Regions:
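A short, proline-enriched helix->beta-strand linker immediately N-terminal to the Walker B motif
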Residues: 181-185
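Conserved ABC ATPase signature
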Residues: 162-166, 170
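ABC ATPase "signature
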Residues: 247-248
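Conserved ABC transporter NBD signature motif
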Residues: 84-92
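Helix-to-loop junction immediately C-terminal to a conserved catalytic motif
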Residues: 76
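Conserved ABC ATPase "signature" region
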Residues: 24-34, 91-92, 129, 133-136, ...
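ABC ATPase NBD coupling module
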Residues: 35-40, 94-110, 134, 139-140
Length: 248
């Protein structure tokens, strides 16, 4: 289907020092705990397949330890899958070189984590333009894009402030603006709002839904919160013990 932006096929991730061999000899009847007991290896992601259409928000929901954060890091190869393929725009990224991968991360995808990872000694605007700087864009272009991004997330007037002067919710807006500034085709969110208090969390959800209406990016959104999943997702994959039990 030419609408598919991301196709994951049979993704496995096993943690341990001999992951390939363990996978090749895996007894399918053993539970995760039994595998760990017998082999000292942890099956974090178990034979997961799904596809994500261009412009949709695909939510992966599960409790902590379900493998959802590991899975999403396999999409960018921050964690190398033990086996399986991740096809983004017809390219299997598990097969590309380190340089192509960095290029892809720089130009095509952005990640937003729960911990904002802002630079304390940079202003809000400088934080937002960081990705553009790495990419080597001209200063004026950087400022223009960063300012646009800043306004998009409702931080107009805060560009010269420093992260410590902002509340948690506002810091998360800066993180969101930074991800948006590079105009990525794919945005990956790992529990971005779960550290915020409920009211601000709802505000941020609404904000992201508005932004998504305007920009129609492809989004992968991880959460443990059922209500958040329903609110944010076009499709929801439920993950448990490293497997996706259903996609709705």
């Amino acid at each position: 289907n030419n609408m598919d932006k991301i196709i994951c096929s049979n993704i496995w991730k096993i943690f341990g020092n001999d992951e390939k061999r363990i996978l090749d000899n895996l007894d399918p009847n053993l539970s995760r705990d039994e595998v760990q007991e017998k082999t000292g290896h942890v099956v974090a992601v178990k034979d997961v397949s799904f596809s994500i259409q261009k412009g949709e928000t695909f939510v992966v929901m599960g409790l902590s330890g379900s493998g959802k954060s590991t899975l999403v890091r396999c999409l960018t190869r921050l964690i190398e899958p033990t086996s399986g393929s991740v096809i983004i725009d017809d390219t299997d990224i598990t097969k590309i070189s380190r340089n192509s991968l960095l290029d892809l991360r720089r130009n095509k995808m952005s990640m937003v984590f729960q911990h904002f990872g802002l630079f304390p000694h940079r202003t809000v605007l400088e934080n937002i333009s960081y990705g553009l700087e790495i990419r080597g864009e001209k200063k004026q272009d950087r400022l223009d894009k960063a300012t646009e991004s800043l306004n998009l997330v409702g931080l107009k007037g805060w560009h010269n402030n420093y992260p410590r002067e902002l509340s948690g919710g506002m810091q998360q807006r800066v993180g969101l603006a930074r991800a948006m500034a590079v105009e990525p085709e794919i945005l990956i969110f790992d529990e971005p709002f779960s550290a915020l208090d409920p009211l601000i969390r709802r505000e941020m959800q609404d904000e992201l839904l508005d932004i998504q209406k305007k920009l129609q990016r492809t989004m992968v959104f991880i959460t443990h919160d059922f209500l958040e999943a329903i609110k944010m997702g076009d499709h929801i994959a439920i993950m448990k013990d490293g497997e996706i039990s259903q996609v709705g």
